[in-house]
């Protein structure tokens, strides 16, 4: 899971609050694996970052500290101790795809079960340091947001929604999404990165609202 995704979401919540009463937001979370080849046992997070980005241990610690500071200012806790590991997220994406399929089209982002599950997964991984590739953990997290634990466990035990995840990942790759977070506004405009709220507000006002006028 990408730490910048939760930071990006927390910033975007401020954008939705800014437009309250003017725009109704519907948020869908789409699958994107930063590390699709991550082994079942995961990988030490510091070692992974140093290997993947070619940086030193000091740089890795500095980056982690910066992320933690930004998240703290937004009300989210990163507890990335020395035991913190990167995890394979494919099965989490399968559950998220299931949760998205359960939502009614008119459901709001802030109350949708898919968003609730995504945020619970962020907390489980980054705050509680739980193994979000473990099926028992994933079933617990699903149940914590009101989803059926038995159905979640059955999905995880099989391959349900796996093909849907792969197809959607391929689609977004074809749309030139190469990293996350990536926000698709109005189904047609991509804004990459965890941008500040003011930037999103300008884009929505000048592009999305103007196009709808």
Q: Over which residues does each language-model region extend?
A:
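Short, cysteine/histidine-rich loop/knuckle motifs that typically chelate Zn2+
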Residues: 4
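C-terminal cap of thioredoxin/glutaredoxin-like
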Residues: 7-21, 25, 29, 97, ...
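Structural alpha/beta surface segment adjacent to cysteine/selenocysteine redox centers
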Residues: 9-125
């Amino acid at each position: 899971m990408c730490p910048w995704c939760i930071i990006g979401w927390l910033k975007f919540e401020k954008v939705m609050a800014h437009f309250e009463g003017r725009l109704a937001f519907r948020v869908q979370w789409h699958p994107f694996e930063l590390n699709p080849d991550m082994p079942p046992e995961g990988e030490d997070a510091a070692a992974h970052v140093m290997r993947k980005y070619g940086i030193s241990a000091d740089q890795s610690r500095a980056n982690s500290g910066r992320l933690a500071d930004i998240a703290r200012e937004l009300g989210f806790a990163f507890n990335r101790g020395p035991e913190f590991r990167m995890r394979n997220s494919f099965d989490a994406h399968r559950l998220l795809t299931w949760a998205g399929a359960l939502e009614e089209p008119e459901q709001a982002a802030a109350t949708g079960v898919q968003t609730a599950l995504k945020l619970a997964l962020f907390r489980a991984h980054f705050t509680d340091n739980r193994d979000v590739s473990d099926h028992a953990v994933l079933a617990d997290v699903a149940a914590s947001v009101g989803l059926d634990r038995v159905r979640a466990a059955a999905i995880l035990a099989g391959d349900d929604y796996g093909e849907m995840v792969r197809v959607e990942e391929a689609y977004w790759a074809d749309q030139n999404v190469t990293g996350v977070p990536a926000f698709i506004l109005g189904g047609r405009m991509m804004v990459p990165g965890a941008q500040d709220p003011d930037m999103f507000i300008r884009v929505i006002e000048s592009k999305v609202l103007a196009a709808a006028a």
